[in-house]
């Protein structure tokens, strides 16, 4: 990548795609990358959420933000996102796989449908999107793939077996891709948050305070993370200066797991 001028933003001239970008952590990441100078296509299965995102960001970032609604657990959905992003802004250098969400319940209370949905939302979305965006990165010998994993894979939170199976697969995808493409200018990392102060967290806290407290009890700092704290780590990993960081699962977790 070319050397930045003194006043240039670190991601100026770069193009990013953020999946799961309409809400919560994904929305925070969209805002962070825009603030760093990237042009961003946000994707989500929630069309109305994407419309609200555009309304929120249009005044400041009208020429730098695009949205595309798709089911990214299907190959065709990921291919459609790739076409839309490239047509709008050109070749993509940064992919943030943030699409996800799972059904959190005791393992034997899952149905075949909830198990499949949890794997589809978290793992298949990352697999398909990585597969369709990697060739462009390899052609330029430069790219950043950042997966949003889960600290629960490491600390074994209650009722997270299915969710951890999906996110653990994402962690494995991270190390496999990082090694495979390490000499081709593409870094692949995972940011693994603990519970984060999103709308989902608020719903859990209100609906099941006892379960929410169990999540809090494993965090030495005694609080959940903030969206901006996760987005900040993603913003660093997306930059050229993070060129020597690859294959890592980096926890943003208030100490809920260490080392």
Curated annotation (Swiss-Prot):
The active site is at 163 (proton acceptor). Its EC number is 1.3.1.58. One of its GO terms (biological process) is catabolic process. GO terms for molecular function: 2,3-dihydroxy-2,3-dihydro-p-cumate dehydrogenase activity. InterPro entries: NAD(P)-bd_dom_sf, Sc_DH/Rdtase_CS, SDR_fam. Pathway: Aromatic compound metabolism; p-cumate degradation; acetaldehyde and pyruvate from p-cumate: step 2/7. It catalyses: (2R,3S)-2,3-dihydroxy-2,3-dihydro-p-cumate + NAD(+) = 2,3-dihydroxy-p-cumate + NADH + H(+). It comes from the Bacteria. Keywords: Aromatic hydrocarbons catabolism, NAD, Oxidoreductase. NAD(+) binds at residues 18-42. It holds the Pfam family adh_short_C2. It is an enzyme of class 1 (oxidoreductase). Belongs to the short-chain dehydrogenases/reductases (SDR) family. This is 2,3-dihydroxy-2,3-dihydro-p-cumate dehydrogenase. The gene is cmtB.
């Amino acid at each position: 990548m070319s050397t930045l001028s003194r006043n240039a933003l670190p991601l100026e001239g770069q193009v990013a795609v953020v999946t799961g970008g309409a809400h919560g952590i994904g929305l925070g990441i969209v805002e962070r990358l825009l603030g760093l100078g990237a042009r961003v296509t946000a994707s989500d299965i929630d069309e109305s959420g994407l419309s609200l995102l555009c309304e929120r960001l249009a005044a400041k970032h009208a020429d730098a933000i695009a949205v595309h609604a798709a089911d990214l657990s299907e190959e065709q959905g990921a291919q459609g996102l790739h076409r839309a992003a490239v047509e709008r802004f050109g070749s993509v250098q940064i992919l943030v796989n943030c699409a996800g969400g799972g059904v959190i319940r005791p393992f034997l209370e899952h149905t075949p449908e909830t198990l499949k949905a949890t794997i589809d939302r978290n793992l298949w979305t990352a697999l398909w999107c990585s597969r369709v965006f990697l060739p462009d990165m390899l052609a330029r010998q430069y790219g950043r793939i950042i997966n949003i994993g889960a600290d629960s894979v490491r600390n074994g939170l209650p009722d997270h077996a299915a969710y951890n199976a999906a996110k653990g697969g994402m962690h494995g995808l991270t190390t496999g891709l990082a090694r495979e493409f390490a000499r081709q200018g593409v870094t692949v990392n995972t940011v693994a948050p603990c519970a984060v102060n999103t709308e989902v967290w608020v719903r859990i806290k209100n609906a099941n305070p006892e379960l929410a407290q169990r999540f809090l009890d494993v965090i030495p700092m005694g609080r959940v993370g903030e969206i901006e704290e996760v987005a900040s780590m993603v913003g660093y990993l997306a930059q050229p200066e993070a060129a020597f960081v690859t294959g890592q699962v980096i926890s943003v977790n208030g100490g809920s797991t260490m080392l």
